Amino acid sequence: MKAYLDLMRHVLDNGTDKSDRTGTGTRSVFGYQMRFDLGKGFPLLTTKKLHLRSIIHELLWFLKGDTNIKYLKDNNVSIWDEWADENGDLGPVYGYQWRNWPAPDGRHIDQIANVLEQIKKNPDSRRLIVSAWNPALVDEMALPPCHALFQFYVADGKLSCQLYQRSADIFLGVPFNIASYALLTMMMAQVCGLEAGEFVHTFGDAHLYRNHFEQAALQLEREPRALPVMKINPEVKDLFAFKFEDFELEGYDPHPHIKAAVSV
């Protein structure tokens, strides 16, 4: 995944050193874009090993509309532990906004179901959008959404997705985000009877934390390997019926994992 390494190198070479909410400090750029052709392999980073189980379970958790980490803990996924309260709650984060966006009249809007219906009925629509950024509820969220809004696009029988990510932790978060939204695009395409097209990743503040510089330099020394292939159970035609066992990754041969601290 040369595109990811190019982003990392660009930030190290051209970024601006800034302070941040966590007190760690970052080097960042504003405005950047990467594109991944999902017909050329599954964009799971090969220059360090990623925990695919966490990526899949987190996505399934989002799609359930869940905002308590119990499901994640039950499946040995700890990526949200630092932000949950004593009861495991995170407030109205991604899953709530995706599946239960509160309307002023008391209704709750299922954005994912609505977009699915529109892709099938009106694929040329320019309103195939899901937003997790709800200004009225941001202060109630344990962590305001970093991957804030995504849009689908249908052309030539293929479904593509563009994500706008307002804040991007390049070393730890972005590899997960790429794989998660690529997988979501593939799942959406399957249940809509389409092929997967491109995943387009657009950033606002893309940053490397200062305590990740050494790890980034190590990763930049590694040569990317061939991308793996993600096999999805073709029998599943309901987006909300997918289970962890419906996904099988083939040909993943990454370089070793690189440890790095999370800034909370």
Curated annotation (Swiss-Prot):
Reactions catalysed according to its record: dUMP + (6R)-5,10-methylene-5,6,7,8-tetrahydrofolate = 7,8-dihydrofolate + dTMP
Major place of residence: cytoplasm
Annotated keywords: Cytoplasm, Methyltransferase, Nucleotide biosynthesis, Transferase
GO cellular component, one term: cytosol
GO biological process per UniProt: dTMP biosynthetic process; dTTP biosynthetic process; methylation
EC number(s) recorded for this UniProt protein: 2.1.1.45
Compartmental location: Cytoplasm
Amino acids binding (6R)-5,10-methylene-5,6,7,8-tetrahydrofolate: H51, D169, S263
UniProt key word Transferase: yes
InterPro entries the UniProt entry points to: Thymidate_synth/dCMP_Mease, Thymidate_synth/dCMP_Mease_dom, Thymidate_synth/dCMP_Mease_sf, Thymidylate_synthase, Thymidylate_synthase_AS
Family stated for the protein in its record: Belongs to the thymidylate synthase family. Bacterial-type ThyA subfamily.
Function as written in the Swiss-Prot or TrEMBL entry: Catalyzes the reductive methylation of 2'-deoxyuridine-5'-monophosphate (dUMP) to 2'-deoxythymidine-5'-monophosphate (dTMP) while utilizing 5,10-methylenetetrahydrofolate (mTHF) as the methyl donor and reductant in the reaction, yielding dihydrofolate (DHF) as a by-product. This enzymatic reaction provides an intracellular de novo source of dTMP, an essential precursor for DNA biosynthesis.
Name by which UniProt lists this protein: Thymidylate synthase
